């Protein structure tokens, strides 16, 4: 499916969904920097609509790519820390208390702020 160009008004509505934050990591983003992520990827049959669009920072949009929300969450849980722990410098920093790995509540920003 070919992507369409979002209008300024549509971009603004998507941006305001989470008050200028990335829907996934929660970092503050400027509307000019915002990337639009399709919650269900177009390649997976998702609609090219505002309802299927989330504001995303560049990094989250890149790594989520065409993954489902479930698969993206599992990639974060299993992949990131596992890959970091393979790095000698990470293990040293962790051993000496220079960094700590915190437990993640397994919720994206948009899930944490739901009313």
Residue ranges and their predicted role:
Residues 5-34, 57:
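Short cysteine-rich loop/turn motifs with clustered Cys
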Residues 44-63:
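Short beta-strand-alpha-helix junction that forms the catalytic/metal-binding core
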């Amino acid at each position: 499916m070919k992507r369409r160009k979002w209008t300024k008004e549509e971009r603004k509505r998507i941006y305001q969904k989470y008050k200028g934050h990335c829907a996934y990591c929660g970092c503050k983003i400027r509307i000019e920097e915002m990337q639009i992520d399709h919650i269900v990827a177009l390649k997976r049959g998702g609609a090219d609509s505002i309802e299927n669009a989330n504001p995303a920072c560049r990094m989250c949009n890149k790594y989520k790519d065409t993954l489902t929300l479930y698969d993206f969450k599992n990639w974060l849980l299993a992949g990131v820390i596992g890959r970091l722990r393979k790095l000698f410098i990470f293990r040293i920093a962790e051993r000496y208390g220079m960094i700590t790995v915190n437990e993640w509540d397994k919720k994206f920003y948009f899930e944490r702020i739901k009313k």
